[in-house]
Amino acid sequence: MSFNNKTIEELHNLLVSKEISATELTQATIDDIKAREEAVNAFVTVAEEAALAQAKAIDEKGIDADNLLSGIPFAVKDNISTDGILTTAASKMLYNYEPIFDATAVANAKAKDMIVIGKTNMDEFAMGGSGETSYYGATKNAWDHSKVPGGSSSGSAAAVASGQVRLSLGSDTGGSIRQPAAFNGIVGLKPTYGTVSRFGLIAFGSSLDQIGTFSQTVKENAQLLNVIASEDAKDSTSAPVRIADFTSKIGQDIKGMKIALPKEYLGEGIDPEVKETILDAAKHFEKLGATVEEVSLPHSKYGVAVYYIIASSEASSNLQRFDGIRYGFRAEDAKNLDDIYVNTRSQGFGDEVKRRIMLGTFSLSSGYYDAYYKKAGQVRTLIIQDFEKVFADYDLILGPTAPSVAFDLDTLNHDPVAMYLADLLTIPVNLAGLPGISIPAGFAQGLPVGLQLIGPKYSEETIYQAAAAFEATTDYHKQQPVIFGGDN
């Protein structure tokens, strides 16, 4: 029996009333994963034994009636550490790495008796926008298996969209939650930088990385964020939790809310059908009582260039730890220490990871630092200031999540620049450390279109309020791909 069409609240009621047990729900989730996994390749590891053991322990002590997520399974992106469960970052470099600790976000979820069902596939070390750079093969889009699911949190999005799990965790460095959420027609939130601890997240770009949430609905997304958000002494960039309940404004109307629509977000490079869908969504927000006005974010056009200098520079530093000495893959054909380093990194990293390490090393090198890395930091400040000017007069910013719907597998992965430009609309949010959400807003060419809502720092409850108002008066989130059990 499958429970994948039940909401979290419905599952909670079934668990509390003992109509089902946590063990039965976990086994049903494992069955849902197995039934769909060959088609989507969303998981690197299904932690069947550990999950059932965790569920049994929860059943023995009893479901907590006051804890909505007690006994609920969830999936975790494979760059987020899980105690005793392989955490590979979808790389040959970490093919055998089992952490001996949980990331703080995972520990927080387990403390609320959530059950880790497995680790999801992803672009290697979170470097990619299509789910195709994984050592374990490409993840497929839940709606059309010939299309990409987006990246880098490809498996976390596809798993939720295909009905394998109800909730999952991902990470977002330049759009890696929001873009796959858009491509798969689900809800994905990147919180304000520092809201969720990065302790236990395998670092890519430390000033950009943020753990976030995937779900079927806006409310369930907020419910999961309630559990994982926390200040953490183990992460010096974590911030005090300023919002007691991220669901607090869900259900409130948005009359009088001021929403900005940047002209740059609907300009050159945006698919005409995507543009039309977003303009229709803007009109819908106006019908709900909000004011939508055009604004300008003039420096957003530099976001991709700034991001790939800063993120690659940080990656070149962060990935120095993978050297074949301490843990993970080690090349066998080494004759000396230099050979260990060179051969291990040459064989252990994929092409995209090597490309970004080289770009970052170049940007930080003597003679180029000022021209590239320092200049990128200066333009990043201008991008932040653009947002601050808009948020002085507006509550939220609205736009498409991605310039297009999901594209064909094995196309843009041969054109790095074109792939990078797919993150054009999400990258500025990371550069500014802002929260952003993608929600389903319609369809183009038979594939989901994502609507992005961006707010000032620590405005997640307002973002959820607006997103939930849109969701409650549309039915896009109710439409499901065939693999889930839908008619599409």
UniProtKB/Swiss-Prot annotation:
Active-site residues, Swiss-Prot/TrEMBL: 77 (charge relay system), 152 (charge relay system), 176 (acyl-ester intermediate)
Keywords, sorted A to Z: ATP-binding, Ligase, Nucleotide-binding, Protein biosynthesis
One Pfam family in the UniProt entry: Amidase
Highest taxon of the lineage: Bacteria
Keyword Ribonucleoprotein attached: no
NCBIfam families: gatA (TIGR00132)
Subunit structure, as described in the record: Heterotrimer of A, B and C subunits.
Protein name (Swiss-Prot/TrEMBL): Glutamyl-tRNA(Gln) amidotransferase subunit A
Organism: Streptococcus thermophilus (strain ATCC BAA-250 / LMG 18311)
Name of the gene: gatA
